Structure formats: C-alpha cells, structure tokens
Amino acid sequence: MSRSVGSLASCYAIGLMALWAGVAQADQGPGAQDQGADQFQGVAPQVSGIPTCFDTNHVVLEINNIQVEYWKTTTPNQFHSRAHVRGPVVRIYNDHSGHNHISVQIGRTADVAIELIYNQEFGALPDLAVGAEVETCGDYITSTAQSGGYPASPDGAIVHWVHRSTRPGHESGYVAISGVVYGY
C-alpha cells in the first residue's frame, strides 16, 4: 500500500511541477527561460547565512513546498513531518499567547498557503508586511480540525518549532525573513 501511495505522491508532485513550469513559461512568453521555477520544483539553492534544515533522521531537507502542498490535501488531521518551505507572506494573523501567526504562500497562488507559528520566546520578529519573503524550517502538522486545545489552522496546516531546539533529539528550525534568520 505504501508503494502505491508513494507512487501517487510522485505523480502528483510531477504533475504540479509540470503545471507550474508551464505556467511560469507562459507568464514569461515563448522562449523565455524560467528564472524562478526552482521555488516550486522542491529543490532550491540555499541562501548564504541561512542554516541547513534537517529532517527527523538528520538528513538535509531541501525546500519541499510541493511535498507540503501534497500533505495539506491528502493527509489526516494531526499528520506530522518536517517542512522546509519558502514563499511570500500573504496574511498576518493576530498574535496570541506569545506567538506570531503568519500565512506563507507555498504554491502558485495565495490560497495555497501554510500557517507559520513562531514562538516569541526565541526573539522578536521584525514588523512584517504582506509580500515579505520567508523561508522556514520546522515541524509540519496538518491542522484541519480542532485538536485538544488547539483550533484548526485557517490555512489547514501549520509549521511550528521554527527555532533552535531546546529538546535533545529534536531538530532545530528557523525563520528567515528577507534573508535575516530568527529563532536560531
């Protein structure tokens, strides 16, 4: 069964990449070379000064926007994994209980977004504006329904633990806003 799910995930990701690459080519006109498609192909170059993101097995985790988008639409509430996403801020939610809540676009349109939850105990974030470029590494959770005391995310999924780890055996995360790293 996992083999067929993996195959389905691969087909879905390949289809998204083809769609996005085609849209990017169309946006630039015939014969144009796509300069920004790497953001949507699951692998992107690291910006200097930004830490390496690791999965739960301490393997380098490249930008995985496509995988995260797939998880959002196919996994049950409270599914957990690691995410390393990059995109522009599309909404800024009210801060509460010492956390910033930021909606970051991970797909081709603003409605394909994930809620980034940043713990202010690891330092203040700058004043944010819609359009600011964000890269983040942390724990992904599908959040489509309330779980315990936590409400569902307005984006249907979250990335949290986006700061240095205070727990042995748990990978660190971070938030980079316009190339400046926070929480690490």
Q: What residue spans do the PLM features occupy?
A:
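Bacterial N-terminal signal peptides that target proteins for export
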Residues: 1-12
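Bacterial N-terminal signal peptides
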Residues: 11-20
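Sec/Tat signal peptide C-region and signal peptidase I cleavage site
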Residues: 22-26
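OB-fold and OB-like single-stranded nucleic-acid-recognition modules
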Residues: 27-184
